[in-house]
Amino acid sequence: CSKLLFQSIAILTAIALVYLFREKAIELFTISICITNTAIMLLSIPGYGLAASIQSLVTCLVTFGEADGYALQLEIHDLTFVFGQMVLYYAVFAPHTTRQEKRKRWRYLLLCCWFFLIGMKRSAIPAVLLFVLIGLLLRKRKVPDWLYPAVGGCCILFFLAFLYCVRNGIISRLLNSVGVDMMGRDYLWSLANPYYELSITYLGHGFEYVDTIIGQWYDAGLINQAFPFHNDILKVFVEMGFPGFLLWSGIQYVLTPLFWQHYADQQTTLLYLCELGYMTVTYLTDNTAFYFWSTMALRLVTLAYVMERKKPPEPKVWMPDSRQEMRDRIRILMQEG
């Protein structure tokens, strides 16, 4: 119940913001998270000193993630993943017709890129680049109506194959063979094997069950820190079972794209799927599916984008003809007479 309540508050907050501010909600949300991240950066400096903080940050950026000291404090998981969503939006979908819109777009894009990079979630950076490229390739193309829901259906099939590979250690062996440091994820995933089965009759253990068994493993000394699975696809399957997992993924990956395609247009559907696709990469290796701000941003950006695209045209105000227009009109009438 707590998870449902938590997620409901995030989604309802996004709806309320869009209801109050319409298309301005994205800009206000961006400003607020930039201010929040800046405040965290400034408040963390006294603990390390200015020179050491700058050196730590530069080292993290140059080495692509060797975070220590001050830079480690800036690895603000929820906010960093949200900045990835905002980078995707401003790079591909933000309005850029007028000069003012172009300036605003570039200003926010640079800010979001900066905060996204200093958060240094290495799995998220290539994911953002991938879906920026996909968005740029598809945003002006007319595709069949069945394509985006079909992509969502393929994602669900991929998740089931992914779970099979996780359970049988295929993912772990593959990544270890190419030298990828899984940072203990493979061990956590193997510990979970006795608690679920890949079967259509598996009904799950209920919400928060994974947190319970993680606590038990920690108390038993099996793990050093009570971290979740770092695999939200596995977590949802263990807790909700096969039917619940199909419901959870079907709503997000099939029904929601169908809704946006019917209510709005293909470009809105593409925005939602690009944002969701980026977040899906993090679902596979992290605990982001139920982060408060990530959940809010995923809904808020698409909702506010719809408000921008569905704005009624500005009413035309009658203006009298100019002196030159009147002369031209009289000349035409005289020629016709």
Question: At which residue positions do the language-model features occur?
Answer:
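Aromatic-anchored transmembrane helix interface
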Residues: C1-L20, L28-C34, T38-M41
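Hydrophobic transmembrane alpha-helices of multi-pass, membrane-embedded glycosylation machinery
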Residues: S8-T13, C113, I125-L137, Q252-Y253, ...
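Structural signal for the C-terminal ends of transmembrane alpha-helices
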Residues: I15-A25, Y89-R99, L133-K142, V166, ...
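A membrane-periplasm/extracellular boundary helix in multi-pass inner-membrane enzymes
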Residues: L42-A51, I118, L136-V178, P194-L198
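Hydrophobic transmembrane alpha-helices and their immediate junctions
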Residues: D145-L147, E239-T280, L303, R309, ...
